[in-house]
Every structure is written in structure tokens, then in C-alpha cells.
Amino acid sequence: MSGQELVTLNVGGKVFTTRSSTLQQFPGSRLMRMLDGRDKEFKMVDGQIFVDRDGVLFSFILDFLRTQQLLLPTDFSDHLRLQREALFYELNPLVDLLNQEHKLQPRPALVEVHFLSRNTQAFFRVFGSCSKTIEMLTGRITVFIEQPSAPASSSNSFPQMTLLPLPPQRPSYHDLVFQCGSDSTTDNQTRIRYISIKPDNRKLANGTNVLGLLIDTLLMEGFHLVGTRTVSSEDRTECYSFERIKKPDALAMNKTLKSETTLMPEQ
């Protein structure tokens, strides 16, 4: 049979059409024996090869044969049944991938926002289970601190101010801290810290407004609020917990060593 020849399969009532070369990738599989007529369990019915197996699960098998990758839906839960189907077709590379089931499970990304409002200042500390989330927020958040650009004149007792942009502090890979509002300096001057969070171009000094913008940013990134609590009854630090389900990676075969597998990011 030519590799470019089309083959129609009826798997449990679901009809699939593909090239014979797609089904011939693994010479030791039952699909290969099905095509050359050596496996008598498969019958030709009205021009279609009838396979008395699960057609829904076969769609994932055919996708694997076409792409050399296994990418399952986030809510997929039939790993054992799919592995049983892979064993039936004697597709050992697919069986090996399914043995890495823990890599196929969706993983939650967690974020906690600690917020403390005290007098005219507000303090933020953001913890993230995924360092990439913290890196994303660090790239979007800018702290603007008032700095005198010229001394006060005799006609004006207030010095001219400019805004110095600074990134939030990163105590570790998994958290960042920043604050906003007004604070007093050693020269008895009151200076204001503003916060800007891209793509919003506003500079906000009010802690409640900054908290709202930060929450909106996380929601737009696919996180959802799962709970709130008071961390400390003494200083009234509020904690907002967020979660985002990360889609599983695609598992791909190593093309040089068929028995090995490589994690491929989802396209």
C-alpha cells in the first residue's frame, strides 16, 4: 500500500480518514499489520476498515500519530482507558508517554496578595508559586517616588518635584514588595510614592485603588479569586488568594531515541 494512499477507518462507529503512512510509523504495531492484512481481527466493511474499539479515544491516538506529540484536554480523565487502547494497538511509544501521567495533569498556579493599609501608606507583598508570574508583575509594576528637582525659592516654599521610576523589590524569585502613599523624609518633607501597572498608564497613590488595579491585572491574566482572609489581627494585613489552572504540556517523542520523551511547551 502506498504511503500517500488514503485509508478510511470505522472505529466504534466514528469514521476517520488518514494517509496510510500515518498509520505505518511504527512497524511493530497492530495498525501496521492491519494495513498489510496480517491481523485478521480487522475487517473491511463497505470500503472501510472496521475496528471494534473506542472511537473517541482513537482520535487522540491518531493525533499522536500525526504530530508525534500527546496533548490532552485540561479536563481529560481517561488516562487508563487511553493507555489500554495504546496497548491494544501495540503503540509502545504512546504507552511510554502515558506512563508519565503526572506530567499530563493540569497544575494550578497560585498567587497571594498581602495588603496592609496604615495611615497614609499602603504596603503590598505578592507571593507566587510560579516565578514567571512574579516576573510578569515585576515587568508591569513601576514605583514612582517624588524627588526634588530644584530647591525651594524665596517666593515658593515648596521645592519642585520630579518622579523617579523604580521597579518593585524582589526579595526572592517567588515574591515582590512595594508600597504607595505619602511618607515623611529625614528633612521633614512629605513625599508621595505612586504605583503604575501596565497597560494602565495611571499613577496611583491610594492603596485601595492600587489593590483594585492589581486584582484586575491578575483577573485579566486568567487568575480567579479563591479566598480572602486576615493574616494578622494586630496589623490587619489582608490576604487575597488567586488560582489559575495551567494547561498541561504536550509530551513529545524524542525523534532520535524513540523510547525517550521530551516535554514540549503547548503551541
UniProtKB/Swiss-Prot annotation:
Subcellular location: Endoplasmic reticulum
Keyword Endoplasmic reticulum: yes
Gene from which this protein is expressed: KCNRG
GO biological process, one term: protein homooligomerization
Subunit structure: Can form homooligomers. Interacts with KCNA1 (via cytoplasmic N-terminal domain) and KCNA4.
Job description of the protein: Inhibits potassium fluxes in cells. May regulate Kv1 family channel proteins by retaining a fraction of channels in endomembranes.
Keyword field: Endoplasmic reticulum
Gene Ontology terms: cellular component: endoplasmic reticulum
Organism the protein comes from: Bos taurus
Pfam families according to UniProt: BTB_2
InterPro entries: BTB/POZ_dom, SKP1/BTB/POZ_sf, T1-type_BTB
Classification via PANTHER family: POTASSIUM CHANNEL REGULATORY PROTEIN, POTASSIUM CHANNEL TETRAMERIZATION DOMAIN-CONTAINING
GO molecular function annotations of the record: identical protein binding
The BTB domain, residue ranges: 5-74
Coiled-coil segments on the chain, per record: none
Protein name (Swiss-Prot/TrEMBL): Potassium channel regulatory protein
Highest taxon above the source species: Eukaryota
